[in-house]
Amino acid sequence: MKTNQNLRFYWRKTHNKLMLGLSYISVIIGLFWLCWILFTLITKGIPALSIDLFTQSTPAPNEKGGLLNALIGSFFIVGAGTLIGTPIGVLAGTYLAEYGRYSRFAQITRFLNDILLSAPSIIIGLFVYSLYVSKIEHFSGWAGAFALALLLIPIVVRTTDNMLLLVPNNLREAAAALGCSQWQVIMMICYRAAKSGILTGVLLAVARISGETAPLLFTALSNQFLSWNMNEPIANLPVVIYQYAASPFTDWNNLAWAGAALITLFVLCLNIFTRLFFQHKK
């Protein structure tokens, strides 16, 4: 009897060590590739950073220049996409959590939202191209903003839905007992309780769409000039990085690495700020 118990204990102990070892190996493999990517980005991107990046537009081959037009274009496109997508996402998430809750329509909407959340970004770009760009017969900054908004909306919907569902029903019932309407309860109670989580979701969504390239290839494309007109093709950092990284010109390659470093630093800082802000609010 004791022999069988010892064997079972030995097998469980061995099995535990084996699985723990495999887990460590998996973590090491994942961190290895991440560290390699970051190391390559730092060694090639950081040395390429200079003041010219922020004062000059993208140059012709073998000439000095910067990424000013691409930075401004990305700011406009990402900003417009955020302004378009955030209200839609928050309102849709509010309906799912406060009005639809567990209704069949809400469940179907959540399912469709999850599909859109996992859809490849290039599919979104093709959709906007066929719906908008092909109709106006030219690329447009607004088309790029619309494509990024479609990528941002499902993230904000899911975050808003989850955060509002975490608000205790006792708060809603107490407000209703004081004579508040449902919309007043949502605005004054639920939003205040969930605002940190909703803001976190919005910031993480902005971090995600900031580096998207595929949708912009089919919508905003790019140009070589400093442009403020969102009705025309407008330069943006992801597409410039894609074009310059694939070019045979060394100066363009260096600008691509510098642009990649800028996007990475922006996303990193935004994620750090989001986590610190969220922890502080807790």
UniProtKB/Swiss-Prot annotation:
Membrane topology: Multi-pass membrane protein
Protein name from the UniProt record: Phosphate transport system permease protein PstA
Keyword Cytoplasm: no
Family, as annotated: Belongs to the binding-protein-dependent transport system permease family. CysTW subfamily.
ABC transmembrane type-1 domain boundaries: 71-274
Gene coding for it: pstA
Intracellular or extracellular location(s): Cell inner membrane
Chief location category: membrane
Keyword Membrane on entry: yes
Domain of life: Bacteria
An individual GO BP term: phosphate ion transmembrane transport
Taxonomic classification: Bacteria, Pseudomonadati, Pseudomonadota, Gammaproteobacteria, Pasteurellales
